[in-house]
Amino acid sequence: MSLLVFLCQIIVLSVLFFSEVCLAGKKIPANFVFGDSLVDAGNNNYLATLSKANYVPNGIDFGSPTGRFTNGRTIVDIVYQALGSDELTPPYLAPTTSGSLILNGVNYASGGSGILNSTGKLFGERINVDAQLDNFATTRQDIISWIGESEAAKLFRSAIFSVTTGSNDLINNYFTPVISTLQRKVVAPEVFVDTMISKFRLQLTRLYQLGARKIVVINIGPIGCIPFERESDPAAGNNCLAEPNEVAQMYNLKLKTLVEELNKNLQGSRFVYGDVFRIVDDIIQNYSSYGFESEKIPCCSLVGKVGGLIPCGPPSKVCMDRSKYVFWDPYHPTEAANIIIARRLLSGDTSDIYPINIRQLANLKINA
């Protein structure tokens, strides 16, 4: 036996041993994250895009800007830590996201992305859901190379997959100011929503075919209440915009039906529907009871009448106490709001997350 062959065998055995130890000692499931800027952990840092958050004051309570579109942690960060993780799920495009690190999960989310490939064009580069699934397929092969088909299948069966998408398909596609005026005249909301659902059905089915079994699907929040939408229509006054919320709820109703359909048709799957619209709407309507002082004005914004239209950046002013604001910037919640949302998704009843919550999902044994 040559020295080279011997060394190669040692390396292979070491990798297999390490992988088995890593899996055997795993107390929490791997975490695979798909979605948009609500859960992006820094993938857009590596893209030529206007949708970036890797500059101050973003991440002010994180220690430094990471590419997260908030002052601190995202919902998936909080959920994964609550399940017992000491680490946060790394972004797919980061050069360090490789080797045994991927056995704990990967974040594929991209700011500005959506279900439809036409969504987010105005930002430049973004990784829409189809491309995120392509990236997961690559990770899947890497994991199989590390630990083999059988162990990889076990890992994927126990892993938590979350998909947080759809908001940009409305905000930055169907309801894009000025640009989408003609589209809304010729495409009825019902038709657009049906297009989203049809595409999403294919995407979630593909995720299942790639090995995912425990899948959390987050609906669209009350986008008519975000500072950007309020500021874009002065006639709304202090009210949320009705039409974006109505279309979001039209989509959400069909999404819940889709989740029930997939649970019925895809053997061994457990899809869970997270009603973030209901949770965030409750926070906004009852903000003071949650300890917030502002549910309309973003913590990070430019001074002036249109401050709620401009993304958070170096020229922005930051509120003194981030824990008192529901919104960090014109689009995204603060960490304080994210904590409330995450807790209700983790442990809420069926009015918040259906048919089971994330803690129950994590403990669920799936053999198929």
Swiss-Prot record:
Gene3D superfamilies: SGNH hydrolase. Pfam families: Lipase_GDSL. SUPFAM superfamilies: SGNH hydrolase (SSF52266). GO terms for biological process: lipid catabolic process. Glycans are attached at residues 117, 286. Residues 1-24 form the signal peptide. GO terms for molecular function: hydrolase activity, acting on ester bonds. It is an enzyme of class 3 (hydrolase). GO terms for cellular component: extracellular region. It is found in: Secreted. Its EC number is 3.1.1.-. The active site is at 37 (nucleophile), 329, 332. Keywords: Glycoprotein, Hydrolase, Lipid degradation, Lipid metabolism, Secreted, Signal. Belongs to the 'GDSL' lipolytic enzyme family. This is GDSL esterase/lipase At4g16230.
